[in-house]
Regions:
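Phosphate/ATP-binding catalytic cores across multiple sugar-kinase/actin-like superfamilies
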Residues: 97, 243-265
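Conserved proline-anchored active-site loop of SAM-dependent methyltransferases
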Residues: 40-59, 127, 263-277, 286-287, ...
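Glycine-rich helix-loop-beta junction characteristic of Rossmann-like nucleotide cofactor-binding loops
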Residues: 36-39, 103-104, 252-258
Length: 419
């Protein structure tokens, strides 16, 4: 029943035209590949880089069915390291990232750079240098409520999103992001009702009456205080530190892109950019050096898109140091694939038993050096148990399985054939 380890150069989930790509790599390592494939094609770039905090940020990885049901057992794993030798080393990375982003963008493209008070001033000057002062569009204030108090200064409860265009022919649609009209406080405007029964407020200026109807759509300005920070028990939570809410990315992507456009995130993290883009019918490119980012994002995409969506994964294969038991039963028009056992040095060291170390897996076929996933199972809060039997149709290629462990490492195996 022992499965045979193999290496695959690429991975495609489901057999349709791809909606996007998840790429595990450092930006210096993948720069040339990105430019050769995507230069001049990206409509919107969103970057949520490290904030120069001097800290490490974690991901809480739940273990097995019990971990997903109760929150324990779980591992605390490194999401990203935000410690730097110097401010210059940080700004050097950001310069190279922004230069790369500019090359990837279309002439009509825009970029949103998410920062906080630590590097805001430095990055604003860097954005002016790379995109030109004329490329500046907005300094968006994202104001939110979160825990924590300060006694020696006012509490810091906002981030800044720097919004720039690559050229003056950029695309932007404010009408695509209407917001609920708020109850306005009493002011000097006069209340009225027109002949159709519509209520409004009016003001006279320069001998002319200006009416503001209560049922007219309202649009956000450059202070966004209507998008909540993710709370600890928010269903969106993946366990990834500094995760951003879908509502925030929804507004950014809607106003700056149209259906079918390509959205890029070079600090992919928990995958909110890719997930939101897919939900809105946009294509996506998400890059991160941490295998956990690719694992979390891929799982979120499968949850949201199911069999209706297709995406590619480009990530290094995990080491050939695991013991996997899997078997496949061929039939006339389908295959039954069973995952029976898993063991790895990391799992044994962490005291994790068997399949509890597997967070997600899929069954599909190897065609050349590409693994094509047909059906999958992943642990989630709503579905903590991992399916150990999957049914898939007969397709061209060798039956194969892909496993992602709790550390985010992905490996490919040929299951033992049973007749």
């Amino acid at each position: 029943m022992a499965a045979t380890y193999i290496r695959c150069a690429a991975e495609r989930h489901f057999a349709r035209e791809s909606m996007g790509t998840l790429m595990q790599a450092t930006l210096p390592d993948c720069r040339e590949a990105l430019l050769s494939r995507y230069a001049g094609t990206v409509q919107c770039v969103y970057l949520d880089p490290p904030f120069y905090t001097g800290k490490c940020f974690d991901m809480k990885a739940r273990i097995g069915e019990k971990g997903y049901r109760t929150g324990s057992p779980a591992l605390t794993l490194l999401a990203y390291d935000d410690r730097w030798e110097s401010r210059e080393s940080y700004l050097s990375l950001m310069r190279e990232t922004l230069l790369l982003a500019r090359e990837l963008m279309k002439k009509e493209g825009t970029i949103f750079l998410h920062v906080d008070c630590r590097m805001h001033a430095h990055l604003r000057l860097l954005m002016d240098e790379i995109f030109g002062e004329s490329g500046f569009l907005n300094e968006i204030i994202w104001s939110y409520q979160s825990g924590g108090r300060a006694k020696t200064y006012f509490p810091r409860k906002h981030d800044v999103i720097l919004f720039y265009a690559k050229s003056r022919s950029y695309y932007f649609s404010l009408k695509s992001v209407p917001v609920a009209r708020r109850e306005t406080r009493s002011n000097h405007m006069k209340r009225g009702t027109d002949e159709d029964g519509r209520t409004y407020r009016s003001i006279m200026s320069g001998g002319r009456e200006y009416r503001y109807y209560d049922d007219e759509p309202s649009y956000p300005d450059d202070v966004w205080d209507d998008v909540s920070h993710l709370q600890q028990r928010d269903p969106q939570r993946t366990g990834y530190d500094t995760q951003k809410p879908i509502r925030l990315l929804d507004r950014i992507i809607r106003c700056s892109t149209q259906e079918g456009d390509l959205v890029c995130d070079l600090f992919g993290g928990s995958g909110t950019t890719a997930v939101t883009a897919a939900q809105l019918g946009r294509r996506f490119l998400s890059v991160d050096k941490n295998p956990l980012s690719i694992a979390v994002t891929g799982k979120r995409l499968q949850q949201i898109l199911g069999g209706a969506g297709c995406f590619d994964v480009e990530a290094p294969c995990g080491a050939d140091d695991c013991e996997v038991e899997a078997e496949v039963y061929p039939a006339i028009s389908s295959y039954t694939v069973r995952l029976l056992g898993f063991s790895s040095p990391a799992a044994r060291e962490a005291g994790i038993d068997g399949l509890d170390a597997v967070d997600q897996w899929s069954a599909g076929f190897v065609q050349g050096e590409t693994y094509r996933s047909c059906v999958s199972s992943a642990r989630t809060a709503d579905s903590p148990a991992l399916k150990t039997t999957l049914e898939m149709p007969v397709c061209a290629g060798e039956p194969c399985i892909m496993l992602v462990d709790v550390w985010g490492s992905r490996r490919y195996y040929l299951p033992q054939r049973r007749y």
